[in-house]
A protein has these predicted regions:
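An N-terminal RHG(E/S)-centered segment typical of histidine phosphatases
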Residues: 71
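Asp-based, Mg2+/Mn2+-dependent phosphohydrolase catalytic module
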Residues: 2-5, 9-41, 46-68, 81-106, ...
Length: 360
C-alpha cells in the first residue's frame, strides 16, 4: 500500500503548476481549483437508505475543514437514476445533513439530455422506474412525445397479460399502432422485467417501430441504455441485480428471437466515456467564474468494473473503497490507484496529495 500511495503522490506532484489566474481566484475565493473530487453515491456515501459513517466528514473536509484551508470542488457521479437531479440532490442532502445542489449531480441518464434536440418531437419509449416517473424526467430534459410500457399495456392489455393495471396507474392512452416509435431509451431499472423485455423487443423488431406491424429480421429503431451495473449494493448483505442485468436479458432475448443477430445500442453511465465528459463539464461549471479547468480529478467508488474502469480510462485518479460491492486488496482486472477502507480515508489521501503539491 505504501508504494502505491507513493506512486500516486509522485505522479500528482509532477503535474504542471497552477496558472496565475487560477491562483488569484483560489486565494480570493478560498477554493483549491487545481483539483476536483467525484463521488459515487451507493456504496461510498450511502448504502441503501443508510448513510456511511465517514461520508459527512469527507464532505466537510472538502468544504474547507482541511490542512489546505480551502474548498475543493466536488460532484456526485452515480449510475443510479429514475429521479431528477434536483430530487437526488435533495435526497442525499437530507441523508447526510449536508447541502448538495442539483448542479453537482450526474445521474446515469443525465447525458441523455443531449439527445433531446434530435428527438424533440419524435415519439420515444422510455423504460424504467415506477409509473411515469422517468417519462416526467424525459419531459424535463426536452423530450415532448414520450410513452411508457404501462401506457402500452393500458392500450392493449393482452400485450402483457400477466399484470392488471389498477385505477391509480398513471398512463397516457393512445393508439400505438398509429404512432410509431423513433427510439427506445432505458432510463432506469425495470420494475417488471417480463413486461419490459416483451415490449422493448416488440418495438425494436416491428417494421418502422410500429407496434402491431409485422416483425422484420433486423433492428428498426435505435436503443439507448443508461446503467450497465450488473449488481449494486443496498441494505441487504449481498449485492442485488442492477439495470445491467436487464441489459443482459435483453441481449439474450434479442439473440434468441433473431437467430443470433447482435443488438445495437448506445450506452450511457459508468464506465463509458460520455459519462465522464459530462461530469467534467459539470465540474467546470461549478467554478465557471474562475475560468479554470481542474488538472486532477479524483474519483472515489466501490465498483471496479464501473467506477474504477471508467475513471482510469478518463485519465482520473481512481480510489476504491471497501464499503460497497468491493472488499479485497485491489481489483485484478480494473486496479485502482489507491484502495482505502472508506470515503473518509479517501478524502484524507487526496488532501495529503494536494497539500504536499500546494506547499512546494
Amino acid at each position: 500500500m505504501a508504494s502505491t500511495i507513493a506512486t500516486a503522490l509522485t505522479r500528482a506532484l509532477r503535474r504542471p503548476q497552477t496558472p496565475l489566474s487560477c491562483k488569484r481566484q483560489l486565494h480570493a475565493q478560498k477554493w483549491h481549483l487545481d483539483a476536483a473530487v467525484v463521488f459515487d453515491i451507493d456504496g461510498v456515501l450511502v448504502r441503501g437508505k443508510q448513510t456511511i459513517r465517514e461520508a459527512r466528514r469527507a464532505l466537510d473536509m472538502l468544504s474547507g475543514q482541511n490542512k489546505l484551508n480551502r474548498r475543493v470542488p466536488f460532484a456526485l457521479l452515480t449510475n443510479g437514476g429514475g429521479v431528477s437531479e434536483q430530487a437526488k440532490a435533495s435526497q442525499i442532502s437530507r441523508m447526510l445533513g449536508f447541502e448538495i445542489s442539483a448542479d453537482q449531480v450526474v445521474l446515469a441518464h443525465s447525458p441523455m439530455q443531449a439527445l433531446a434536440p434530435k428527438y424533440h418531437d419524435s415519439h420515444v419509449l422510455v423504460v424504467g422506474g415506477p409509473d411515469r416517473q422517468c417519462a416526467d424526467i424525459a419531459h424535463m430534459y426536452g423530450f415532448r412525445n414520450v410513452s411508457t410500457p404501462n401506457d402500452i399495456v393500458a392500450w392493449r392489455p393482452e400485450i402483457w397479460p400477466f399484470i392488471t393495471l389498477g385505477p391509480e396507474a398513471r398512463v397516457e392512452r393512445r393508439q400505438f399502432d398509429k404512432h410509431p416509435f423513433a427510439a427506445v431509451m432505458v432510463f432506469h431499472d425495470s420494475f417488471d422485467f417480463g413486461r419490459d423485455l416483451q415490449i422493448v423487443t416488440d418495438v425494436l423488431r416491428s417494421r418502422d417501430g410500429r407496434l402491431g406491424a409485422e416483425y422484420v429480421g433486423r433492428q428498426t429503431v435505435p436503443l439507448y441504455l443508461s446503467n450497465a451495473d450488473l449488481i449494486f449494493s443496498n441494505e441487504y448483505v449481498r449485492p442485488r441485480f442492477g439495470q445491467g442485468a436487464f441489459h443482459e436479458c435483453l441481449r439474450a432475448m434479442w439473440s434468441a428471437l433473431t437467430r443470433g443477430a447482435s443488438l445495437e445500442y448506445t450506452r450511457y453511465g459508468k464506465p463509458f466515456a460520455v459519462q465522464y465528459r459530462h461530469a467534467e463539464q459539470v465540474l467546470d461549471a461549478l467554478v465557471a467564474p474562475a475560468n479554470c479547468r481542474h488538472r486532477r480529478i479524483y474519483a472515489i467508488g466501490d465498483n471496479p468494473a464501473a467506477d474504477i474502469a471508467g475513471a482510469n480510462a478518463a485519465g482520473w485518479t481512481s480510489i476504491l473503497v471497501r464499503t460497497g460491492v468491493f472488499s479485497g486488496a485491489n481489483d485484478s482486472e480494473n486496479p485502482a490507484h489507491l484502495v482505502v477502507d472508506h470515503v473518509g480515508d479517501a478524502v484524507e489521501k487526496i488532501i495529503d496529495i494536494e497539500h504536499q503539491r500546494f506547499t512546494l
